[in-house]
């Protein structure tokens, strides 16, 4: 079976990639509610308050939530979106989302598109099945997702994804974003005290993150022939190859044609989601590759890393690969 699968894998050709007619700078952040879209779709007073909250950490007034939600909904519907979700990072090494449609009863037997500030700011969901580190009983099921305005909303398919934190009903963090935001605030406070020794006009310290994503690409046929990969997503049996991390000739080598097509489509989709991908190359081990973006503000960079890992899985399937 394995020899036949390997033979079939060598016969596969690269999937053609449709490149947009525009330059990357023109379609960058096409599916992101960034400041350009905020300025176009929000009242000026609301835009200024939201930017002040993002840049300076000023608390948001609940009164601006309704115009923000209205502007966000208008843009999303124009982009063909039908649903929205509070998107967060539970303690499962992935992302979580629950999709709700932009529909409510209109009181006349019909439906109307609706998205209020209340729905934007906070939602209550079932948190009983998420890992919690033993901080609560399983019957205490309520969890709350709260909007993080410092990370812009984005569109995936027909869904508007709104980055949020996720906490239990007693206030404990049930995700990775809330502790990250707290640590960024702590670093900012400590760094400001040092900066004020040199310049009292310093008001904010920005934490930047330059991540890189290494990954392995495995042909779908070979992947399906390995029960350990199917069940766990990693190798648990078999012998190591004679050379793995010692393959210096593979590092920075010519990128295989099928892999190059995968990388091209991944970069196009990443740029549309506002992820500034810049570098791609072979890594050391067989079938190991790497992608790296331009560094960004820490919270945004972390969200982009989560988005791109999910994006890699989807794009890989279209090219006959599975990503490890």
Task: State what each model feature region is.
Residues 6, 24, 50, 191-194, ...:
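Generic structural signal of hydrophobic/aromatic residues within well-ordered alpha-helices
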Residues 2-21, 138-152:
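N-terminal hydrophobic targeting/anchoring segments and the immediately downstream early-domain regions
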Residues 9-117, 121-137:
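Histidine/acidic residue-rich metal-binding segments in metalloenzymes
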Residues 140-324:
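Glycine-rich, acidic/polar active-site loops that bind/position phosphate-bearing ligands
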